[in-house]
Amino acid sequence: MSNKINPKRREPTAAAAGAGATGVATNTSTSTGSSSAGNTSSANTSSSSSSSLSSAGGGDAGMSADLTSLFECPVCFDYVLPPILQCSSGHLVCVSCRSKLTCCPTCRGPLANIRNLAMEKVASNVKFPCKHSGYGCTASLVYTEKTEHEETCECRPYLCPCPGASCKWQGPLDLVMQHLMMSHKSITTLQGEDIVFLATDINLPGAVDWVMMQSCFGHHFMLVLEKQEKYDGHQQFFAIVQLIGSRKEAENFVYRLELNGNRRRLTWEAMPRSIHEGVASAIHNSDCLVFDTSIAQLFADNGNLGINVTISLV
């Protein structure tokens, strides 16, 4: 089974009609941010913090839940976790918000680099809810486990898996396919574990991508072919498959991509990416099927490139 996938440049949205399917492409750029934290000094906690805590000792679940409110950041309402810094009046703010502030959000005083050691000690005995509790996570964690859990939490919101950065949607896994069908109607879905992904007009200049969905084994997979210019004047194609699901679910599958023609064969086999991981990092690290334009021409037919895609259970 095959369907033509027309290219779509990576610019806002432009879909062209194909033989029952269209592709999606947008101009992409990657930006990275960095932050730095200044040196901190240790000091005794202010009287306001320590007096609040002295009457709230204990470690049962109910008291732990009550104590978490003491760690709420007044700016983002996330939790302030060690290392905990306070202003000269004893007010707390989380590290993320602190880097964006010039004064204490509570008293407008200066942001001193003073460690609140008493609150840090209390934090080690308090269990915090996962930040994705609003999406259904019921985990209760000590602060040393919180960040690691949240990075892989099965309840954390999924980003739109479509290539490019134009779509800002995010939501629970069970709404991803609904989002794709409603907001990305140009993407066609083919049924079966063996299909042919036919990308049209591969000779178009610039950054272009082709996208198709494949449905089998009760799951949905997104097939992505991107053409990028990683180095000046050197264009490359990157082909990869991602599962609309978690990494744990992705471990149950393996995909195989194959270019075939003119007595030549080029193959790639790997575990599909999960949409939590996305495809950007894999493409950046060339952890996918990679070939340049000269190789593409060996397998292309009148500017169209067919890729055999096979999904298998492990």
Curated annotation (Swiss-Prot):
This is E3 ubiquitin-protein ligase sina. E3 ubiquitin-protein ligase that is required for specification of R7 photoreceptor cell fate in the eye by mediating the ubiquitination and subsequent proteasomal degradation of Tramtrack (ttk). E3 Ubiquitin ligases accept ubiquitin from an E2 ubiquitin-conjugating enzyme in the form of a thioester and then directly transfers the ubiquitin to targeted substrates. Residues 122-314 are annotated as: SBD. It comes from Drosophila melanogaster. It is an enzyme of class 2 (transferase). One of its GO terms (cellular component) is ubiquitin ligase complex. Component of some E3 complex at least composed of sina, ebi and phyl. Interacts with eff. The gene is sina. The lineage of its organism: Eukaryota, Metazoa, Ecdysozoa, Arthropoda, Hexapoda. The keyword Zinc-finger applies.
